Amino acid sequence: MADKPTKGLADVVAASTALSDIDGHAGRLFYRGYDIHDLAGRTTFEETAHLLQRGRFPTRGQLADYGAELVRGRALGALAETNIPEIAEKQAPMEALRTLVSLASGDDPDKDSNSPEANLRKAARLTAQQPVLVARYHAARTGAEIPDPDPELSIAANFLLQITGRTPSDHEVEVFDACLVLHADHTMNASTFAARVCAA
């Protein structure tokens, strides 16, 4: 006798990952085994990004090195930078970010390497550049003048500085940093899942 067919997507495994685990029934989210409730508001986005990208929480020294890598990684190459005004005129925000990330990859010094070390460097640069790309896109759409990224500020603080044009309060940074931690990973975007279903 054949197995009873599964209705809908119940018990269907769409992907395997060591990064995050979602228990929808219990309303729980884990990053590399850590409950999101233990991370959000207690760790920084930089610590969480290190955990997701490198598999472990950073020591103080590793966090300082990773933070310096992120600061260096904020610099945009000419390919993305020069195209922001035109993209801001023609594309909606998510389309623009997709396009700008693709353009930024064209200037990436590790673009022709797929080694694990190069991929970690690319992940750090992508993490650092996306907030800058979004802020520059926003400025191009609104005509706002924005400050350059401040190497002394976190990703959350820098993004708020560049979007608003003013130094954010500690409370604003804490709230936005927690938001970044909460949204750092959720296994697979709905659009990616839909594309995989269509391709199957």
Map each language-model feature to its residues:
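Hydrophobic alpha-helical bundle cores within soluble ligand-binding/oligomerization subdomains
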Residues: 1-200
